[in-house]
């Protein structure tokens, strides 16, 4: 089809003097139109111009048939008065332009999720949005994919590069629609250009080769730039000089009333691009919550994903680990808040690290306080320990001299300046105090067992052993029993001096 003239909807130009349309893969492209409008329509056009206003450029052939050649949204409108006439200039961009405005953060962790589903989620945020993957749509992501401080347009282009291919906006339809990859058509339209230019971009080939783009040869860096009045679309397959090419770029200009087009042609392999990564994610971390723990790996629910499920098992960072199995093993629990850290541009290299201290919840603090209170009544010694050193998890965070390990079941190890305290949270504790010595308190039995000797010696004072009902000392068949009423000694021989 040849365009003998063009029309712009919903605007009515009395005469169009300039029109430039640019379309390109991996780019939004744009259209600019300039022409005369009726003076009495100035205010109406200024009023109707708004964000997301759809504008369509149609080509009309010699028999009056009309086809939309560019459909997008109004980006800019300017009206100039000159010698009692009105000249209006407009700029139109495709709907995919809306995808390139706001950086976003989200993740896709389900390793079985196909790439087409990833793009479906992205495009669901746009009215009339849709993405058709001609390449790789059924492939599973296999590893986490994280969109970090990227616009949706940048993210889609990066996903496309995983398959060494390009993104093409739908320039002729309403809504944010795009295509990933090119389609090999059963037949190619033959081009008979008025003139053409050949260019070989050797540096482009070298760049792709050094970045591990497979399936290309040096001739794939050959470009043909041809002029033709026939209308073709970006990504369309054409035949030129007995070879098949694809259109990488279209530039259309108005010459009088007719539209002339300049096409950039490449081989199918010439469209291949190196795999791209998001360098912005290097050194970044995302907040989340532990959902599952297994051995030394965890699953996380990231805050940026809302209710989306967690799938990938991530390593958990530790202060020390060795291949021989030695090291520090202290895993978080489900519900703990953490950060997912990315040391490189590859999401699969991410690992979970600890989070900043958070305020102790009322439930947790209350349970800890209650546990301490119940233990405080057991003995006077225990009361002293409790009053001086609260076992509430929040209390130790107020004193930097305390190094504390506290579990959700109220188990605690407290390393202070003058003492070490081990507390089970159930009425049993051991305290080693620089000033007061060692205190062992237990709500259950205390057992000391040794395969060899046990020595109890007091060099500076007395050794006191007390029992509520009795104290028994046994050795083989000999026994001494001390009760409130009697001292009973039994054995083969008993000597009292």
What are these regions (language model features)?
Residues 1-497:
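Amphipathic alpha-helical and helix-coil boundary elements used as assembly
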């Amino acid at each position: 089809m040849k365009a003998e003239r063009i029309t712009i909807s919903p605007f009515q130009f009395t005469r169009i003097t300039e029109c430039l349309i640019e379309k390109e893969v991996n780019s939004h492209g744009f259209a600019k139109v300039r022409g005369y409008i009726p003076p009495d329509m100035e205010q109406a056009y200024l009023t109707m111009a708004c964000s997301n206003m759809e504008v369509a450029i149609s080509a009309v052939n010699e028999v009056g048939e009309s086809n939309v050649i560019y459909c997008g949204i109004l980006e800019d409108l300017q009206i100039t008065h000159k010698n009692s006439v009105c000249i209006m200039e407009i700029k139109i961009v495709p709907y995919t332009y809306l995808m390139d405005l706001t950086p976003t953060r989200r993740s896709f962790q389900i390793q079985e999720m196909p790439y087409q589903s990833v793009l479906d989620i992205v495009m669901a945020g746009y009215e009339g949005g849709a993405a058709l993957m001609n390449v790789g749509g059924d492939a599973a992501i296999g590893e986490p994919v994280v969109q970090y401080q990227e616009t949706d347009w940048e993210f889609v282009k990066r996903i496309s590069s995983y398959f060494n291919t390009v993104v093409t906006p739908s320039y002729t339809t309403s809504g944010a629609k795009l295509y990933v990859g090119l389609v090999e058509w059963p037949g190619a339209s033959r081009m008979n250009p008025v003139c053409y230019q050949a260019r070989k971009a050797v540096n482009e080939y070298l760049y792709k080769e050094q970045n591990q783009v497979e399936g290309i040869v040096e001739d794939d860096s050959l470009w043909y730039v041809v002029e033709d009045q026939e209308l073709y679309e970006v990504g369309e397959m054409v035949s030129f000089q007995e070879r098949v090419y694809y259109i990488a770029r279209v530039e259309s200009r108005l010459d009088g009333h007719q539209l002339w087009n300049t096409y950039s042609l490449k081989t199918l392999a010439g469209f291949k691009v190196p795999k791209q990564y998001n360098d912005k994610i290097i050194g970044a971390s995302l907040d989340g919550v532990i959902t599952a723990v297994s051995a030394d790996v965890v699953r996380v629910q990231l805050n940026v994903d809302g209710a989306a499920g967690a799938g990938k098992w991530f390593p958990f960072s530790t202060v020390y680990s060795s291949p021989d199995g030695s090291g520090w093993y202290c895993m978080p629990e489900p519900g703990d808040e953490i950060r997912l850290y990315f040391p490189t541009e590859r999401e699969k290299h991410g690992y979970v690290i600890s989070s900043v201290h958070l305020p102790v919840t009322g439930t947790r603090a209350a349970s800890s306080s209650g546990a301490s209170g119940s233990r405080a009544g057991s003995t006077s010694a225990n009361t002293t320990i409790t009053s001086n050193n609260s076992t509430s998890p929040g209390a130790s965070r107020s004193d930097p001299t305390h190094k504390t390990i506290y579990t959700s079941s109220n188990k605690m190890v407290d390393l202070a300046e003058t003492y070490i305290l081990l507390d089970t949270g159930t009425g049993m504790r051991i305290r080693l105090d620089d000033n007061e010595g060692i205190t062992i308190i237990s709500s259950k039995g205390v057992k000391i067992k040794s395969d060899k000797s046990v020595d109890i010696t007091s060099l500076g004072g007395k050794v006191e052993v007390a029992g509520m009902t009795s104290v028994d000392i046994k050795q083989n068949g000999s026994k001494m029993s001390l009760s409130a009423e009697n001292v009973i000694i039994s054995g083969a021989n008993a000597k009292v001096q």
